[in-house]
Amino acid sequence: MGTSSLSSSGNLIWFITGTSQGFGFELVRAALQRGDSVVATSRTPEKVQKEFSAEADRLLAIPLDLRDPANIAAGVEKAVKRFGRIDVLVNNAGHGLLGAVEEASDSEIKNVFEINVFGLNRLTRAVLPYFRKQHSGHVVNLSSIGGLVGLPGWGIYNATKFAVEGLSEALAAEAAPLGIRVTVVEPGPFRTDFLGGSLTTAKEKIPDYEPTAGQTRQYAIDRNGAQQGDPVLAAEAIIQAITSENPPLHLILGALAYQRAAAKIESLQKDFETWREVALATDFKS
């Protein structure tokens, strides 16, 4: 069975995490404006419920704890009971950790992996049985350009998003014969709360890393609220992509993200070609 496109579907049922602000909030708005129905989850669902009270018949705002498998299962069950199915799962909830790799503590690392990777995977695993049963569905994982390119100060956050990239690519191959699609979204800097309340800075500061990770910390302070990316346009782009006839596996958003991804590909190609003979000489001789 091949993958099915949402382009010819009627009104969609969305299940979106992290909807109190940023990409999640704007996706709720854009989906409701399309006439779709939305299950909006966050730690403070009251905000979403109040903002979109006029669409209460097409909105279910519920709290969701991505650390709690039982809570996740109950949330998914509520969604299906209310709307009959789920068409699109958007794993948007996430958290940042800023600091050099050596500066980050075990507990800081575990906390960001818990939400960005384990929580995302828990929810995906809870929704997939419904997708398999209906032979359709689309998983949208919010990664980052930091899931393709590692930068000073973002090492641990990069690691979580690199994990999301690998998970998404593998799931796409596994689920395609079942009618399920996957898209991993890689935004650059957007004017959300990511550099504010959604970001934790490693407590330890090592002076030797001031010219690298330290400069990134200062960048986060200086650029917060002045990022060039518009989350409203990002939400529209995500919807356009996943409702197209051939949705992409990878969706890069923003000029800076596009430039960094292109530079990464060029750098990889250069390494591949430089070390081609060495690479090809390591197999057993047949």
PLM region spans:
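Substrate-binding pocket helix/loop in short-chain dehydrogenase/reductase
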Residues: 100-101, 108-110
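SDR active-site lid
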Residues: 177-247
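Active-site helix of classical SDR
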Residues: 124, 160
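Residue(s) in the substrate-gating loop at a strand-loop-helix junction
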Residues: 144
